[in-house]
Amino acid sequence: MAQLLDSPGFIERSAAVPHKAAAAPATRDAAAPAAVPGAAVSFELVGKVFDGPRGPAAALREVTLDIARGGVFGVIGRSGAGKSTLLRLVNGLERPTSGAVRVNGVDVGTLDERGLVALRRRIGMVFQHFNLLSAKTVAQNIGLPLKIAGVPKAERARKVDALLDLVGLAAKRDAYPASLSGGQKQRVGIARALVHDPALLLCDEATSALDPETTQSILALLADINRRLGLTIMLITHEMEVIRAVCDTVAVVEQGEVVETGPVWRVFGDPRHGATRALLRTLAHDLPADLAARLRPLDGAAPLPCGAQLLLDVRYTGASGGEPDLGALTAALARNVGDAVHFVHGGLDRIQGRVQGRLVIAASLAARGAASPDRIAAALAAARRHANRVEVLGYV
């Protein structure tokens, strides 16, 4: 498909001029971050304030963010965090109160109505709700933006047929929305978003109204479109499973601020902000209630009682990039604290080619009797050579 915004001057070639009602851009401090060359979208110290019944309310605060061209960028946060506002700034549905939003280097806030129309024709948008016209067929729904743009009928038909093949709905060409499943309706919405050959696709909670199985099929379709067409995708969601399944990079938004950003594997494997850890809670391998109820803390220098099982929390963050050697890990523990070492809880996952996760390991002390603090410390030191983090939870 045609590349979006062929050069930084594409908007100007679409007859854009500075918006007459817009104030002149404020002079930025010399230390303010500049747009990253080659970035599809850049947010530079962006703030957005809405007038509420109780006075001004800040939806975004000094957001600085760069979205690389050709990737799938996820934005996640709780309800009301500012995610959708961030998205609406990209296609000019909202204007920033401060800062600048740049698409391929062009400041969206300086565009007049003609410039915004040119911009929006090159940015696809997929919504949470399908917004299909019930009285029109699948093909007619997809082709409507082309008809409005004055594209000839024969060309529209060719384009619609190609998009139907792309989203797997060729057999539903003449069907009406009432006969479609939720996933099929969203596929129509995705096809419609691609009619103007965009290279930037915005997805606002595109799977939140779908069941888990259908969600996975839509995410697989988005990933396929990203690979085949080279689209940059900016995806808004409140589900960490969606981020894990399809995104390359993620930004966590909390109360209008971007509190954490990075490759998905790093943010999932080593979350650094409380908001990120809270969002990941649904995917965390928390200690089961039966183990938590029996868990006892270590008592300083006192050895463990005979028959106790030492519980260790073993974490793989993906930072090493290699495959975990679980055999070496258990052997190191067995040499130091117990002959019987086994896994009691947890799991490992692979994200962007990196293995990460949490394992709770029990080392039985029955065969050796009491284990001294020195022996436990030696076991931890040995185990840490085979994992990113190893900590003692206590004993049962």
UniProtKB/Swiss-Prot annotation:
Q: Which UniProt keywords apply?
A: Amino-acid transport, ATP-binding, Cell inner membrane, Cell membrane, Membrane, Nucleotide-binding, Translocase, Transport
Q: Which CDD domains match?
A: ABC_MetN_methionine_transporter
EC number assigned by the record? 7.4.2.11
Disulphide bridges, residue numbers? none
Q: Where found?
A: Cell inner membrane
Q: How does it sit in the membrane?
A: Peripheral membrane protein
Boundaries of each ABC transporter domain copy?
Answer: 41-280
Q: Where does ATP bind?
A: 77-84
State the top-level EC class: translocase
Q: Its catalytic activity? A: L-methionine(out) + ATP + H2O = L-methionine(in) + ADP + phosphate + H(+); D-methionine(out) + ATP + H2O = D-methionine(in) + ADP + phosphate + H(+)
Could you state a single Gene Ontology molecular function term?
ABC-type D-methionine transporter activity
Q: Give the coiled coil ranges.
A: none
Q: What residue range is the signal peptide?
A: none
Function description: Part of the ABC transporter complex MetNIQ involved in methionine import. Responsible for energy coupling to the transport system.
Q: Which family does it belong to?
A: Belongs to the ABC transporter superfamily. Methionine importer (TC 3.A.1.24) family.
What does the annotation say about its assembly with partners?
The complex is composed of two ATP-binding proteins (MetN), two transmembrane proteins (MetI) and a solute-binding protein (MetQ).
Q: What is this protein called?
A: Methionine import ATP-binding protein MetN 2
Native species: Burkholderia pseudomallei (strain 1710b)
* Recorded name of the encoding gene: metN2
